Amino acid sequence: MKGITLTAPKRLRGVIEVPGDKSISHRSVLFNAIATGSAHITHFLPGADCLSTVACIRALGVTVEQPAERELIVHGVGLGGLREPADVLDCGNSGTTLRLLAGLLAGHPFFSVLTGDASLRSRPQRRIVVPLRAMGAQIDGRDDGDRAPLAIRGNRLRGGHYELSIASAQVKSALLLAALNAEQPLTLTGRIDSRDHTERMLAAMGLEITVTADQITIQPPSEATAPTALSLRVPGDPSSAAFWWVAAAIHPDAELVTPGVCLNPTRIGAIEVLQAMGADLTVMNERLEGSEPVGDVVVRSSSLRGTTIAGTLIPRLIDEIPVLAVAAACASGETVIRDAQELRAKETDRIATVAAGLSAMGAVVEPTADGMVIVGQPGQLQGTTLNSFHDHRLAMAWAIAAMVARGETTILEPAAAAVSYPEFWQTLAMVQEAA
């Protein structure tokens, strides 16, 4: 699918079961691979990134069955059971796969090489390599370890204390996984305020991990505290649901429902921002499923106003910023996004690509070093041709913008959406047909 052309529909209606959460899907496979016993995982996200994790785990000697598209059975091999891979581990386009595996493999006594596609090989890895080396890991890579391929010669690691300088769940998780093969406890301080699925899942698997407001400490597992398999239903991904929340909020005649979405406090920044912008957004039927809070989110047509997105909000909605920028372009007044320099290290430089795309649609957008300023105006977007640059979040953000744009919007390389949302285009058609 080289390109898709969209026009704004008269109405949007539907109940949308969004795909399983991408972060939790990755972790359910990685963590259960080193657990004792077998785990049954349902509502797994069968997107390209998560399937890269499955392929790498299989290459490390773990049996992973897939009885249905969204269902896995992972037969754990225990903490010391991974075996040296016979070939290079290809992480595809998945930064989560590469970074979490780097942490996990750094403490295993064998040689491995992690690589990926051209986009992943261009993304910075020093953020994990430097702290892992401080724990005693032997990791080499291009540009002194800042670019994949990464060659890892695993060995016994040190624990101790490390202060995180950026709020990144991938960095935090890589270090916590490395600590499972460390000789002492590991304590993390600093920017620990990123999504906490790793901490929740490891605790649910029986590991001794203590989390406070300003630090995380994990103890090296003993026989008594070795991880045990954790079966789970993966909740809906709030980063995927956010596309529908914004679509409903900016469209003049819309009501969309996303049931069973993960409402982890570290992931609901987009809900808080949309509510601050005046969105008609209701959270219902809140409950706990496994180690994660979930609920149903209903959004109706709204009159949005500009807001500020910055500070501790950023790590709680970093993946939703492209579509929140679309919401800002359709709101009344100015929206300021700052402290989001992490966007420049994503699949594309999302500050540059989002600003350029919205500007091409007629929005007033000024990119900055760590974000952008958007002067919103309802009804200002004009259809045009936009490139996803193979970035899944861009492809879907442009589709949502097209729902309110005048004229036709053509999106190039729309198949990129399959990385995190394989059914996105079918669902988009459904909510227009149901109207």
Swiss-Prot record:
It comes from the Bacteria. It catalyses: 3-phosphoshikimate + phosphoenolpyruvate = 5-O-(1-carboxyvinyl)-3-phosphoshikimate + phosphate. 3-phosphoshikimate binds at K22, S23, R27, S168, Q170, D319, K346. Pathway: Metabolic intermediate biosynthesis; chorismate biosynthesis; chorismate from D-erythrose 4-phosphate and phosphoenolpyruvate: step 6/7. GO terms for molecular function: 3-phosphoshikimate 1-carboxyvinyltransferase activity. Its EC number is 2.5.1.19. GO terms for biological process: amino acid biosynthetic process; aromatic amino acid family biosynthetic process; chorismate biosynthetic process. Keywords: Amino-acid biosynthesis, Aromatic amino acid biosynthesis, Cytoplasm, Transferase. It is found in: Cytoplasm. The active site is at D319 (proton acceptor). It is an enzyme of class 2 (transferase). Phosphoenolpyruvate binds at K22, G95, R123, Q170, R350, R393. GO terms for cellular component: cytoplasm. HAMAP family: EPSP_synth. Belongs to the EPSP synthase family. Catalyzes the transfer of the enolpyruvyl moiety of phosphoenolpyruvate (PEP) to the 5-hydroxyl of shikimate-3-phosphate (S3P) to produce enolpyruvyl shikimate-3-phosphate and inorganic phosphate. NCBIfam families: aroA. Monomer. This is 3-phosphoshikimate 1-carboxyvinyltransferase. It comes from Chloroflexus aurantiacus (strain ATCC 29366 / DSM 635 / J-10-fl).
